[in-house]
Amino acid sequence: MPLRRFSPGLKAQFAFGMVFLFVQPDASAADISAQQIGGVIIPQAFSQALQDGMSVPLYIHLAGSQGRQDDQRIGSAFIWLDDGQLRIRKIQLEESEDNASVSEQTRQQLTTLANAPFNEALTIPLTDNAQLDLSLRQLLLQLVVKREALGTVLRSRSEDIGQSSVNTLSSNLSYNFGVYNNQLRNGGSNTSSYLSLNNVTALREHHVVLDGSLYGIGSGQQDSELYKAMYERDFAGHRFAGGMLDTWNLQSLGPMTAISAGKIYGLSWGNQASSTIFDSSQSATPVIAFLPAAGEVHLTRDGRLLSVQNFTMGNHEVDTRGLPYGIYDVEVEVIVNGRVISKRTQRVNKLFSRGRGVGAPLAWQIWGGSFHMDRWSENGKKTRPAKESWLAGASTSGSLSTFSWAATGYGYDNQAVGETRLTLPLGGAINVNLQNMLASDSSWSNIAGISATLPGGFSSLWVNQEKTRIGNQLRRSDADNRAIGGTLNLNSLWSKLGTFSISYNDDRRYNSHYYTADYYQSVYSGTFGSLGLRAGIQRYNNGDSSANTGKYIALDLSLPLGNWFSAGMTHQNGYTMANLSARKQFDEGTIRTVGANLSRAISGDTGDDKTLSGGAYAQFDARYASGTLNVNSAADGYINTNLTANGSVGWQGKNIAASGRTDGNAGVIFDTGLENDGQISAKINGRIFPLNGKRNYLPLSPYGRYEVELQNSKNSLDSYDIVSGRKSHLTLYPGNVAVIEPEVKQMVTVSGRIRAEDGTLLANARINNHIGRTRTDENGEFVMDVDKKYPTIDFRYSGNKTCEVALELNQARGAVWVGDVVCSGLSSWAAVTQTGEENES
């Protein structure tokens, strides 16, 4: 009769049970029905299971290591018995960030292994540095490797954010409103206003952007302008966009300085995408550590411990995100079981880089369409009419080690233009930037800049120069200017000194020069606040006009609790003024900052200017808008008043909410249902945001992953039980507005004394409410949490009889003593016969 087939689960259980029965072969004990493989007797039943095939775990083991405590599972292998020969049918590798990695050669050998037989020692050699060892006693497969066969576990420099968490239509509207009034000295005045709107409506990763402004609202000169009307999809590392936008909003990888003002109607496509996040905070040169077993890696610089990280066995790249920027050496120390295994010096190369960061793949973008060029004029000398033209171009950017570059080639109005941008750090102290433009009408431009940190770390220097010559087609002006400046930190030489900064600008085209020199020193810093000294001079000369010189000196006093005060003097326009300024900041409330300033001429000839001027301002942060109100009376006698306010509105389905924040064009609506001024907090990626009332909208940056956790607010007396919807994980694209509707119970800790209708105390009685139960003490007193939506307590007795206490908790917050309360429906406690739980529930 044929043997019964085993299911995969039964095979594994049966096999693990049989390994304990295996014995070394012995002539007197050998069973004629058993088979011997690798020195182990295989019973016939287990032999049949092997013939059917079974899966065994695959572990990586470092050659020379004692025991298997540091082995790591890296996959599984399917083994089977074929005509008395044990073989591996296939190996399935399992990727894990914490596991050791094998070299590419070893990995290829493993993945291509098929029907490979074990030798008599139950071993399959793979390379000179790796082999497979099968243990039938433990029923596991080991990949035994030397260090040379190990790969390196590198940290990912890029990651796609994945699909959107919002699968329905939603929208974010950002608004910015401003109004200003100028009151003239002769009594006249003028008022103007504007309203800018930016709307992004999205369905998953698809979104449409509308951006425009209204000007002169309420006046006879009202105007409007649409700056962008565009469809965009940025997903999985590629971006497509199509529609209308002005040249100020044109996205490009490389410089595009020769594009004149106007509107573009066209398309673009490329891999310059925000949906792929590049990590540029790691060292460009990986810091690698080898661990023969699980242990620690210590990074030390100049005797200072910078980082301690834990790793399993293998070659691992050390996380350098938290290390300081710069190029420097660190000592990498590997510690296993409390002993230093190795110590070596490696170089960290972390520099601020533009774009996608060092090591990112080549980025590219192609674009084109119809170009409406606006009318152009240069100081009234040159004038070009508005014109329609074609536009087409391509951009690309990349990096090699610390060197980064970008290039753009495009054409319009029968002109071809090429532009490049190069950035090259030289060591850790010097950074060189070059930007060039060349056009077919003989136009060219060169912008060069060098910044350097001088030895000792107490000073820095920068030099910039621009030269531009424009031919007869491009709508751009010539330029010829240079600038030089630096900062000297004298504090590093002597602690009582401060910081001195100087700059010089020379515009040779307009024959203008501008000098500045500033000095700042901290005079006092302690428990009572800080006192700083500021002094400076500016000198400006334009063409043949006489030089204009301004000077100032001021003392800045910063006090605890957000107070700031400044007093000083300035000299400009031929007279000297004394200045006073004060500012107060608030952590809570609608008004966040108030300030005022006052200036009075104390010497010199003021001419037509007033001797007294000043102003006041306030910054506010309300539920639906935030902004600034400013009133200022200038020395020329004009009184200027302006108000700015901005905010956002989020919408999805039946849910709509507004906010005074404008953090991004995506967001979350929290429909908490809290009554009145109830408050909880939302913890989003580690940041805490207050949520007040029934519904809140929180704008967030698009192309981001967010971990959202609702919790009680430390600033509220109320206590809430967040039953469901406490934690959420969101991926948001532009225009995505997620809705979180948690089940929130407002809890009040109620204490009191409960009586029957005749006044007798309910002693040692088990009482219940909507969410829990408790027991009174000998005096009928109790303490229990109550949901404010269900402010009742009941007591069940005599089987199915119930009495109930109705609590008045409308104004209660946190904890409340309700005193004596009556359980209506229970005439007397003495009349209740209590036998254990018989009269309680």
Swiss-Prot record:
Residues 1-29 form the signal peptide. It comes from the Bacteria. Induction: Negatively regulated by H-NS. Positively regulated by IHF and EcpR. InterPro entries: CarboxyPept-like_regulatory, Pilus_assem_C, Pilus_assem_E-set-like_dom. Pfam families: CooC_C, TcfC. SUPFAM superfamilies: Carboxypeptidase regulatory domain-like. Transmembrane segments: none annotated. Keywords: Fimbrium biogenesis, Signal, Transport. Belongs to the EcpC/MatD family. Part of the ecpRABCDE operon, which encodes the E.coli common pilus (ECP). ECP is found in both commensal and pathogenic strains and plays a dual role in early-stage biofilm development and host cell recognition. This is Probable outer membrane usher protein EcpC. The gene is ecpC.
